[in-house]
Amino acid sequence: MTHIQPRPCQLTSPMPSGRYKPFVPHKLPDRTWPDKTLGDAPRWLSTDLRDGNQALVDPMTPARKMRMFELLVGMGYKEIEIGFPSASQTDFDFVRQVIESGIVPDDVTISVLTQAREDLIECTMQSLVGAHRATIHMYNAVAELFRRVVFNIDEKQCICLLYTSDAADDTPCV
């Protein structure tokens, strides 16, 4: 019977690891968050009502979206993204329907999505008039292909979009 020699856990390496100093952790006595643990459930935000580009051919009907909104509320969601009102009249109308129908419970925050363009921000703000509580998810796509193909803008124009968020300051209803 041949005796097999165990291999060491890690083979020696030709890399000059001795040249490098070991990691020295920073001592930050006022930093307490690493010792904290989660005691409550996280806040979940449903984005199920925003169809997105994948549904341009066959989007959800307003009636189906309304049933889904009621289902999400029934499941206990406290934050629900209900649409992209500046992207289509259908989404704008659905946002208005949700607000005007009064079906949003007091403890639920509705959310909408918009691109960071002044005209689209204004349209989005108008869709939310009368909402008890709402958030706006504003984005600015910075990927070169997305800028060029979808938005037809260059990098300089994309940077200029950063300064359009001031439009929200003029609408205190949201």
Whereabouts are the PLM-identified features?
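Glycine-rich tight-turn/loop motif centered on a GG-T
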Residues: I99-S111, A143-I159
